[in-house]
Regions:
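Conserved ABC ATPase "signature" region
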Residues: 105-121, 142
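A short, flexible loop at the N-terminus of ABC-type nucleotide-binding domains that lies
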Residues: 1-23, 27
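H-loop/switch region of ABC-family ATPase nucleotide-binding domains
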Residues: 180-184
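The feature captures the beta-strand-to-loop junction immediately N-terminal to the Walker
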Residues: 34-36
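Q-loop/switch helix immediately C-terminal to the Walker
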Residues: 77-102
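Helix-to-loop junction immediately C-terminal to a conserved catalytic motif
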Residues: 49
């Protein structure tokens, strides 16, 4: 369904690398990509969604080159850029989006009510708090008609109760999903998901997400490592069952790097 082949993305006047030779294939599964802030996670999703221009490489979606695809309704995302284009309140945005996706708006409106977000319906997206906006975009992306869902930091600024409910919605969804996060606590709940690390625009992996409790990160190269990551922070290696710092013990990728460095 999705084939990303050696894509490179650069930005700014200095043409700084955002993604470097990134390749990933998703066909009938779900993928979690974990990395620190500024590692290229969001850029990758924007590239797949057609919101970021590639400098080289290719992306094929549903068997077609992404540059030839327009108005593809089988893909959805929680990236707010998509919904901010609609200058209308939250309820009208949900109704229009549902019409485009050929589904009943009540499917999303019922979830909004279950998440205690009904007071957001008469407000514009930009008027919502960070957590409210994130949650509404999450619910919009989790349309039952979607075949590929791109989730960028779906748990960011979300309270514990909603995080639990959201995790259930995501893990039970039938679509293929690519989810970016810098948090580790959710990974052990993603049984059957593939896991990749991303640092400085380079993708490393893959593992089973539920295996994260057995993974360790080490400064430098250690014997019997699974793979080595060469980064601007230094050289790191990932090992299984023993090592310097347990990946699952860290709250998020940023704190993990602080511990190991």
């Amino acid at each position: 369904m999705l084939e990303v082949d050696k894509i490179n993305v650069r930005y700014g006047k200095n043409r700084k690398n955002a993604l470097i030779n990134v390749s990933i294939s998703v066909n009938g599964g779900k993928v979690a990509i974990v990395g620190p802030n500024g590692s290229g996670k969001t850029t990758l999703l924007k590239a797949v969604a057609g919101l970021t221009r590639l400098d080289s490489g290719s992306i094929r979606l549903f068997g077609r080159d992404i540059t030839t695809i327009y108005n593809e309704l089988r893909i959805s995302t929680n990236l707010p850029d998509v919904y901010r284009l609609m200058r209308m309140n939250t309820e009208d945005t949900i109704r229009l989006y549902s019409e485009l996706k050929k589904q009943e708006p009540e499917e999303i409106l019922n979830l909004v009510e279950e998440m205690d977000l009904s007071d957001t319906l008469d407000k514009m997206l930009y008027e919502l708090s960070t957590g409210q906006q994130k949650m509404i975009c999450n619910l919009l992306s989790l349309s039952s008609s979607s075949k590929l869902i791109l989730l960028d930091e779906p748990f960011e600024s979300i309270d514990l109760r909603r995080r639990i409910n959201l995790t259930e919605l995501i893990t039970n969804h039938s679509a293929e999903i690519i989810m970016n996060t810098h948090e580790f606590d959710v990974l052990t709940k993603l049984k059957g998901w593939s896991l990749y690390f991303i640092m400085e625009g380079r993708l490393f992996g893959k593992f089973e997400a539920s295996e994260v409790k057995n993974l360790y990160i080490n400064k430098g190269v250690v014997p019997n490592n699974i793979f080595i990551m060469e980064t601007g922070y230094g050289t790191f290696s990932i090992s299984r069952d023993q090592g310097e710092v347990s990946v699952s013990a860290a709250r998020n990728f940023n704190s993990l790097l602080n511990e190991v460095t």
